[in-house]
UniProtKB/Swiss-Prot annotation:
Gene3D superfamilies: Mur ligase, C-terminal domain, Mur-like, catalytic domain, NAD(P)-binding Rossmann-like Domain
Family assignment from sequence similarity: Belongs to the MurCDEF family.
Database matches in NCBIfam families: murD
Subcellular location as annotated: Cytoplasm
Pfam families per record: Mur_ligase_C, Mur_ligase_M
EC assignment: 6.3.2.9
Purpose: Cell wall formation. Catalyzes the addition of glutamate to the nucleotide precursor UDP-N-acetylmuramoyl-L-alanine (UMA).
Name of the protein in its database record: UDP-N-acetylmuramoylalanine--D-glutamate ligase
GO MF: ATP binding; UDP-N-acetylmuramoylalanine-D-glutamate ligase activity
Catalysed reaction, written as an equation: UDP-N-acetyl-alpha-D-muramoyl-L-alanine + D-glutamate + ATP = UDP-N-acetyl-alpha-D-muramoyl-L-alanyl-D-glutamate + ADP + phosphate + H(+)
């Protein structure tokens, strides 16, 4: 772990005792701080106690005793309303921080020879794939790399730092809201589209949270900016005018005179005097579709920012094994391929997967996001049939009515069973695509659990076929 410095002998309240909170609590104690731990959920409190932590009921505590309050990323700061912990901290004058801020301060306080390189990645979609891809390139290039953050590994639980290490961190807008001291050697903003507006209030506030990743960069640092959306293009233009760092625009939709871009699956490096083709991404089996070409362009540019040669970065792109729940083929039964894209928690992410197939049987729904699936109407002709689950099912059925066949399946298991029956009956090669365009929290703990439910339902079909054989 990374012992947190700066709070020796003082008490830090930690609210939220899932992976991030517990990793932070361990790191604070290792650094000499005292901790006051609490969570609204009894199961989370029990897990902390099972690990040997004492609990402090923060609803009854004197908050003036806390040097800082460490909040887990899911705790709302402003919208739809400030969480009670936020109000109590502000009343007591206690500083509110997140685990990334604790990490950043610890790095900044370390001697120069011990400070690692930091790559920080954000964006609306593609963060996890790009984070894992950069980590893969670094590892294959012989770097001592540690991957963490929003990808599922609390940063403070990673191995302690040294001057030769590279930390590759996926950062959500929630985490960036609580971060002000991070200085990343390489930053990546992949793309920006409307998401999490129930948490940020407005699109301007959401974009502002994403831009926080650029704080504290200066001469010698690199910013990789996706310019295929208007928000990214605007950020790129504005920071180019500031002229403080190396800026590398990336695109998967257009050729550029400067930057890194992918056209028809071919990756070009235009950071030198002329554009050079460096990779044929269509040969990278784990990076299908234009959205993954953007991820690859960003990862390549980030690796170059770390001093890895273009030839080596391109070579290691091709051996990336992929990530679970991101356009992951989980099984092929006869002529039917089952694709798990459970990570598609909004319509824009679902668009990436839907655009990759000419026809598909679509499993969608869950806890709806603002805007629903209205923005996907141009892709409805590709839908052989839709199988709708969760809270969004009735609303999605209304949107699809008259445009694509749809049925309200209710559960993932029922949807898989129905989709397979229809695809099998058609007698042709077919895709059954789970790309929900929704959050998962109405039926599952997270998108991973939803993806595993899909995998289990497909396995049940496979087992049934084996028994019948």
């Amino acid at each position: 772990m990374i012992p947190v410095s700066g709070f020796e002998g003082r008490t830090v309240a930690v609210f939220g005792l899932a992976r991030t909170g517990l990793a932070a609590a361990r790191a604070l104690v290792a650094g000499g701080a005292k901790v006051a731990l609490w969570d609204d959920k009894p199961a989370a409190r029990e897990a902390a106690q099972a690990e040997g932590f004492e609990l402090t009921d923060l609803t009854r505590a004197d908050w003036r005793e806390f040097a800082a309050v460490m909040l887990s990323p899911g705790v709302p700061l402003t919208h739809p309303a400030p969480h009670w912990t936020v109000e109590r901290a502000r009343e007591a004058g206690a500083e509110i921080v997140g685990d990334i801020e604790l990490f950043a301060r610890t790095v900044n306080a370390a001697p120069e020879h011990k400070r690692p390189k930091i790559v920080a990645i954000t964006g609306t979609n593609g963060k996890s794939t790009t984070t894992a891809l950069i980590g893969h390139i670094c590892a294959e290039a012989g770097r001592d790399v540690r991957i963490g953050g929003n990808i599922g590994y609390g940063v403070l639980g990673l191995e302690d730092m040294h001057g030769g290490a590279v930390y590759v961190l996926e950062l959500s807008s929630y985490q960036l809201d609580l971060t002000s001291s991070l200085h990343a050697d390489v930053t990546v903003i992949l793309n920006i589209s409307p998401d999490h507006l129930e948490r940020h209030g407005t699109m301007d506030e959401y974009v502002a949270a994403k831009r926080r990743i650029l704080l504290n960069q200066g001469k010698g640092d690199t910013a990789v900016i996706g310019v295929d959306d208007p928000w990214g293009q605007r950020i790129c233009t504005e920071i180019t005018a500031a002229n403080r760092r190396t800026i590398v625009p990336v695109s998967a939709s257009k050729a550029m005179s400067r930057g890194v871009y992918a056209l028809d699956g071919l990756l070009y490096d235009a950071t030198g005097e002329r554009a050079q083709e460096v990779a044929d991404l269509k040969r990278a089996r784990s990076l299908p579709g234009r959205h993954n070409w953007q991820n690859a362009a960003a990862a390549y540019a980030a690796a170059r920012g770390l001093g890895i040669s273009g030839e080596e970065a391109a070579q290691h792109l091709m051996t990336f094994p992929g990530l679970a729940h991101r356009m992951e083929t989980v099984a092929v039964l006869g002529k039917v391929r089952f694709v798990n894209d459970s990570k598609a928690t909004n319509a824009d992410a679902a668009r990436q997967a839907m655009s990759s197939y000419p026809k598909f049987y679509w499993i969608a729904g869950g806890l709806p996001k603002t805007g629903g699936i209205d923005g996907l109407i141009d892709l409805f002709p590709r839908i052989e049939k839709a199988y709708l689950v969760g809270e969004a099912a009735p609303a999605f059925a209304d949107v699809l009515r008259g445009k694509a066949p749809a049925v309200e399946s209710g559960t993932i298991e029922a949807a898989v069973r129905q989709a397979y029956a229809d695809a099998r009956a058609a007698g042709q090669e077919a895709i059954v695509l789970l790309s929900p365009a929704c959050a998962s929290f109405d039926q599952f703990a997270d998108f991973e659990e939803r993806g595993e439910a899909f995998r289990a339902a497909v396995q049940k079909l496979a087992d049934g076929q084996a028994d019948a054989a």
